[in-house]
Amino acid sequence: MSTSSSDPFYNFAKTSFKSAAAQKASATSLPPLPGPDQKVPGMDIKYDVVIVGSGPIGCTYARELVEAGYKVAMFDIGEIDSGLKIGAHKKNTVEYQKNIDKFVNVIQGQLMSVSVPVNKLVVDTLSPTSWQASTFFVRNGSNPEQDPLRNLSGQAVTRVVGGMSTHWTCATPRFDREQRPLLVKDDPDADDAIWDQLYTKAESYFKTGTDQFNESIRHNLVLNKLAEEYKGQRTFQQIPLAATRRNPTFVEWSSANTVFDLQNRPNIDAPEERFNLFPAVACERVMRNASNTAIESLHIRDLISGDRFAIQADVYVLTAGAVHNTQLLVNSGFGKLGRPDPANPPELLPFLGSYITEQSLVFCQTVMSTELIDSVKSDMTIIGNPGELGYSVSYMPGASTNKHPDWWNEKVQNHMMQHQEDPLPIPFEDPEPQVTTLFQPSHPWHTQIHRDAFSYGAVQQSIDSRLIVDWRFFGRTEPKEENKLWFSDKITDAYNMPQPTFDFRFPAGRTSQEAEDMMTDMCVMSAKIGGFLPGSLPQFMEPGLVLHLGGTHRMGFDEQEDNCCVDTDSRVFGFNNLFLGGCGNIPTAYGANPTLTAMSLAIKSCEYIKKNFTPSPFTPAQ
């Protein structure tokens, strides 16, 4: 951040002060962590594998390795707050599926901003007796080192068991060749084959499908209209969704829990598996051996008791997210604390936190047109007026002249007869639209044409939500070295770890032009469905609001040639037992949702671990 000498932080930043986290010597004599329940059969202290983070990527590692016989411990800074199914999606309640706008508050309550610039607005109307600050150092968790002009202001994290999968959209598209990282050099067909294998397995873990909304009137209304308008130009389909439809009005949305049941093992259902989950544990650093070739222990802090422990394992896997993986590594001596200095690059992982990417996002909401709404009941024969004696609504099942299938017409007829007070012919519990036209070279952005809850975009009570269609288009960003995530040696976050700071701008040239083209595309396309909702006109959203941060610990074939941190098995260069998982591995410019791709890379990583590390023997309880 560029500061002037009149800014109080200017002089402070030039001092030799270091935060407690930056000063802290790496302890080497921490006690081992006791088991969560010493009565659990087969429990002991040393593990085959420790996993940091309990989101879908951590659960992918857990599933693959626990089922292969490894003794696994998982640590998460968050607590269990998703009910009986640990790490389950919080939208899996009837209440939120009946009123999706209520779920907005859940998302907002879960997200914690990563880097907030100092608010320099002075409250000069306080009582003269009240204490008043004379500087702009740190207040309300703000970051005085963050340049507001180079921030990802919308970037946030979720600190609960299950991570963001407890409130995500469940969109799981595959990347095409243009977006994917290469796993096989100089052989596109072989690369396609390995990706197809990985994607297929990941989709089975997530229960990804493209037919959960086949019998939604609103979904088909939007899908068919767009397919007609763009016939021969664009292909429209349902968004690939990690979800299972349980009945016509209820969907079970997938989450970390879908990938792996986070119950401790051994248990009745898995008597020969070994797994333990430790919530509310801050993982502070990994300890390197003297030769910098392996990790010897993980240092953690119990957030409830305040006690610190050293955890030993054969394999260490960090899946705490693109920000926190990088934060933990920097706090462990990888990369470097403090503002990046090109003249003095770090020795370990010099590209850590460089070349970061985040998608551009355009958003609007439309109210469906009268033409579309009237077409819903086009097969109905209507006699009389609603509420009057003799009013009837009927249709001819199977008639060749019908524009809609019988399931559609039956729903409309029943609704119009049973709810004559409703001016809309769409049933109250009709599922929302979930439409996309996928990323393609001619239109290199991802689209979500749907009705869902985000941290923004709630609809006021005066507008019937059945009429609303959300439009979210995601644009790719070229990786540039100057776009960085770095960590302060002076400021700490709420968990006493080095404060993350962004130095980011969308690059000029291709990235910026595609973002502008994407906005135009959304405006033209959305106008074919209806008029804009007041207050939700087409707009670019805050950088980072997509929450698809990537490239913080990039993947490649060669550390120096590819400017990266991990190889194609997600193993940190130079270390035989340290692995990183998540979107931070993805080094490419991508527009689509990255979770399925990150999960696929985790599956490949597990294949390497299983080939190179042997599970410890399992001793059944006596």
Curated annotation (Swiss-Prot):
Residues 1-28 form the signal peptide. It holds the Pfam family GMC_oxred_C. Binds 1 FAD covalently per subunit. It is an enzyme of class 1 (oxidoreductase). Optimum pH is 5.5-6.5. It catalyses: D-glucose + O2 = 2-dehydro-D-glucose + H2O2. Keywords: FAD, Flavoprotein, Oxidoreductase, Periplasm, Signal. The active site is at H548, N593. One of its GO terms (cellular component) is periplasmic space. Its cofactor is FAD. The modification Tele-8alpha-FAD histidine is found at H167. Its EC number is 1.1.3.10. Gene3D superfamilies: 3.30.1920.50, FAD/NAD(P)-binding domain. GO terms for molecular function: flavin adenine dinucleotide binding; pyranose oxidase activity. Substrate binds at Q448, H450. It comes from the Eukaryota. Residues 29-38 form a propeptide. InterPro entries: FAD/NAD-bd_sf, GMC_OxRtase_C, P2OX, P2Ox-like. Catalyzes the oxidation of various aldopyranoses and disaccharides on carbon-2 to the corresponding 2-keto sugars concomitant with the reduction of O(2) to H(2)O(2). Plays an important role in lignin degradation of wood rot fungi by supplying the essential cosubstrate H(2)O(2) for the ligninolytic peroxidases, lignin peroxidase and manganese-dependent peroxidase. Belongs to the GMC oxidoreductase family. This is Pyranose 2-oxidase.
